[in-house]
C-alpha cells in the first residue's frame, strides 16, 4: 500500500505564528558551451528526457508539491481581487481618455519644473539622469532639437556596437527611420505645435512588442518569418499618439524565457555599470539603453520579474503594473496570466508620465478583472507628506535578508529607515507562508503557458532554431502535466489569500528587488548560451508575487554593493495601487538620489 499523500491545511486555518521561513535550495547544474549542448540533447531525447526531467522535478520538490499533495482550495486561473479602497491624494486620469490628455493631466501632479536646478551653472553637479521634462525644456527653449538628439543617439548606438566587447542593446535599428521621426518632431516644435510633453522623447521597445514597421522577433532568429507585424501594439500606439520617437527594437533574453539577458543570437546585452556583467532580463536591452543614457524610458514586458530585475541590476526605475492594467494586444505574450507591458525609466517622474500614456485595460479585462479607476499620485498636493507619513510598510525580515550578500538587504533596510525617519512611515513585521510553493506555481504557470504558445512552432521543425537555453526550458515546461497546472492554480489562490491578509495591515510590502547584484557573464556563454537556474533563482527570489498574483510593483535604486554594482529596493502594492507605489517610490528616489552613480558606459545625448 502506497504512502498517503500530504494534505495542506485549508488556507484560512493556517497558523501564521507557526510558520518557519525556509531558504530555497534549488538543485540544477550550471551549464555553458559543450556541456549545455550535451544536456539539451539528453533533455530532448525520448529515451533520457523523461527520466532527466523527472529527476529534476523530484529534486526540487515539484512532484511532491503538485502531484503528491492534497490542496483543498479551488483553482484561480486569473488573479481575483476584492474591491479596493480609493487611493488617497491621487488624480483620476480616466481609463478610456486620450493618452495625450492623460499625460497632460499627469504633468500637473509633478513639482514645478525649475531649469536652474537641472541646468546649474558653475561647478560640475553630481550625476543625474536627464528627465523627460529636461528634453522638453531644451526643445522649447531652442537649446537643441529632436533631430540633433537623434544624431547623438545614432552615434552612441554605432559606437557601442563597434566596441570590444560590443554592447548589443538593439536587435533592430534603422538610423534613417529615426532621423525621419525626429525631423517630423522638430518641425512640430518649429511650428509651435508639439503634441505633448512626450513629443520628441526617445523610447525603445522590447523585441516582443509590436512597433510598426519593425519586425517582432522575440530576439529569435526566425519569429518575424512566421508572424508579421501589421500595426503597433496598443501601448506603442498610445505613445506614438503623444509624439514619442522610437529608437528601435531592444535586445532581450530569447522569448523572455530567462532572467540574465543572455542571447547568443544577437549578442548578450552588457550592464552599463560593469560591461563584464549581465543586465538581467528578460528586458535586457531596454534596461541597458535607459541606464546608459541613450533614452529616457523603454517599454518592456514582465512575466517573471523581466522589467524589475534588469532595472535593479542596471540602477534605474522599473514599474510592473497590475495584471490587466495595460492592454497587451500586439505583444507576443498577450495570452498568458502573469505578464504585463510596463515602463523602465531613468526616474520615477518619467515612469509616471510614460505609465500615464500606456495605461488602460482592454475591454475583456475590464469585464473579468474589474480594475479600479486609473490614477496617479498628486505629488504637489498639500497632503502629500501626510499621506506618506501614514504609510505602513510590510517587511518579512527573514525573507528580506535571504540574499547572497547582506550588503544588498542592509542597503535596502537603510533606505526604508531613512524613509521612516523623514516622513514618519511605520514598518510592520509580516509573514508570507509558502514562498517555495509560490515559486513552483509560477514556474509551472508561466512555463506551461509559454510552451502552449511555442509548441506548434517547436513541433513544426523550429526546435533547433531556438537557443540551447530556451530549448532546456521548453523541454522542462513540456513535461508539466494538466495536474501540475491545476495544482499550481490552487496554490495561486492560497498565496493570494496570504497577501490579501497582509494588505489588511500594511499598504506596501518591501523587499530587495533581487537576491544578488549583477552576475558576471561567463565567456563560455557568449556563443552557445548558459543555463544557471541557481543564479536565476537568486534574481527572481522576491519578484514572483507580482506575476503569479498580478500585483503592481516597482524597483528603485537605493545604493551600490562593495563592487559598485546597483542595488534596487522593491515595493509591492495592493491590486491597482500603482499611484501609491509611485508616491512612495518618488520619496525613496529623492532620499537616495546622491547615491546614484554615473555608469561607466554612459552617453549624454542631450549635452553631447
Curated annotation (Swiss-Prot):
Forms homodimers. One of its GO terms (biological process) is defense response to bacterium. This is Fatty acid amide hydrolase. Substrate binds at residues 303-306. PROSITE patterns: AMIDASES. Inhibited by methyl arachidonyl fluorophosphonate (MAFP). It is found in: Endoplasmic reticulum membrane; Cell membrane. The active site is at 206 (charge relay system), 282 (charge relay system), 306 (acyl-ester intermediate). Keywords: Cell membrane, Endoplasmic reticulum, Hydrolase, Lipid degradation, Lipid metabolism, Membrane. Its EC number is 3.5.1.-. InterPro entries: Amidase, Amidase_CS, Amidase_dom, AS_sf. Belongs to the amidase family. One of its GO terms (cellular component) is endoplasmic reticulum membrane. It comes from Oryza sativa subsp. japonica (Rice). It holds the Pfam family Amidase. It comes from the Eukaryota. The keyword DNA repair does not apply. It catalyses: N-(9Z,12Z-octadecadienoyl)-ethanolamine + H2O = ethanolamine + (9Z,12Z)-octadecadienoate; N-hexadecanoylethanolamine + H2O = ethanolamine + hexadecanoate; N-dodecanoylethanolamine + H2O = dodecanoate + ethanolamine. The lineage of its organism: Eukaryota, Viridiplantae, Streptophyta, Embryophyta, Tracheophyta. Catalyzes the hydrolysis of bioactive endogenous fatty acid amides to their corresponding acids. The hydrolysis of endogenous amidated lipids terminates their participation as lipid mediators in various signaling systems. Converts a wide range of N-acylethanolamines (NAEs) to their corresponding free fatty acids and ethanolamine. The keyword Protein biosynthesis does not apply. One of its GO terms (molecular function) is N-(long-chain-acyl)ethanolamine deacylase activity.
